[in-house]
């Protein structure tokens, strides 16, 4: 009888173990069963155009520890750190560049090792681990809540991420493996999160969150803007003439851009620029906001007002309000 009970207990424990791991590996699929993959694709393209990293993975794919370290160090531009000549990293299950990158990340506390000489690069990184790594890498610890003895509770990392806006639109999955869809959204939010600055006065250093100082501005010399596309290489809604090949106008400002954006004229967009260079642009227009007028139906344009014939053959007028760009 005892053997039967023992065998049943072992079977139950094994079942629970595999069930938990199956949920951990595939649980993210439930999160994204109704998700908008367009946003994920847009964010992946954004990071590629900014030259940060290329996350060529399905939205529901889970992130390994090695991939997380590589993406995080690229995000904060620490991936160019090289090991001294002849120095081999301590992890036996890694070699080459990945070995030193992992050792650097562990030394900074961005991720933990499993043992002194084992990193387990192919294991999944957990949501809480990823959040902690991002928060530490962005330098938030000086302004985080601490315990009475000065230590930082594990819960403070999630609290800081929430405070900084890194959790905006993110489904928090706690101790489960993080998916690419969730990780990319965390990185996207972290791009424009305000960073920590400090001032020295009276022999004392005070740390504070500095508005306007972000990863995007400080590390990539770029800026996120919003506007309306006023022209592409085919159409100019103000009648100022067509733009040049591979060109686009946003708020009537011309940008040379190698990609084709033929369907954005008149739409609200978010875009990223570095100096005068357009890095990436995408529509944030809602479908119900569209008024589509075929060019063949336009009868005239004067004083910022279009005269056109609608689908019922009636003459209509549509004005572009003053100050609307």
PLM features: residue spans?
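Cationic, glycine-rich low-complexity segments
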Residues: 42-43
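Short polybasic amphipathic segments
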Residues: 242-250, 303-311, 324
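Beta-strand/loop nucleic-acid-binding surfaces
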Residues: 251-262, 315-325
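Extracellular, beta-strand-rich glycan-interacting domains
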Residues: 187-189
């Amino acid at each position: 009888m005892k053997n039967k009970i023992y065998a049943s207990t072992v079977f139950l424990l094994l079942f629970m173990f595999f069930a938990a791991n199956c949920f951990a590996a595939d649980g993210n699929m439930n999160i994204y069963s109704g998700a908008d993959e367009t946003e994920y694709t847009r964010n992946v393209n954004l990071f590629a155009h900014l030259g940060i990293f290329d996350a060529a993975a399905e939205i529901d794919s889970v992130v390994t520890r090695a991939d997380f370290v590589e993406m995080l160090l690229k995000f904060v531009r620490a991936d160019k750190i090289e090991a001294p000549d002849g120095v081999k990293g301590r992890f036996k299950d890694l070699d080459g560049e990945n070995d030193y990158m992992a050792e650097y990340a562990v030394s900074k506390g961005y991720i933990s090792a499993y043992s002194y000489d084992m990193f387990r690069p192919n294991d999944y990184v957990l949501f809480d681990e990823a959040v902690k790594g991002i928060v530490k890498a962005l330098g938030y610890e000086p302004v985080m809540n601490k315990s009475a003895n000065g230590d930082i509770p594990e819960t403070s990392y999630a609290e800081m991420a929430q405070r900084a806006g890194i959790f905006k639109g993110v489904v928090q999955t706690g101790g489960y493996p993080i998916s690419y869809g969730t990780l990319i959204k965390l990185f996207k939010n972290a791009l424009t999160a305000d960073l920590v600055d400090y001032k020295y006065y009276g022999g004392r250093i005070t740390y504070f969150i500095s508005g306007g100082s972000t990863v995007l501005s400080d590390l990539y010399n770029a800026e996120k803007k919003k506007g309306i596309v006023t022209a592409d290489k085919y159409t100019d809604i103000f009648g100022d003439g067509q733009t040049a090949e591979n060109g686009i106008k946003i708020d009537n400002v011309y940008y040379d851009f190698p990609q084709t954006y033929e369907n954005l004229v008149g739409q609200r967009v978010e875009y990223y620029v570095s100096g005068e260079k357009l890095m990436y642009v995408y529509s944030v227009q809602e479908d119900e906001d569209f008024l589509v007028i075929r060019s063949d139906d336009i009868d005239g344009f004067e004083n910022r007002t279009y005269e056109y014939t609608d689908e019922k053959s009636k003459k209509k007028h549509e004005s572009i309000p003053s100050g609307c760009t």
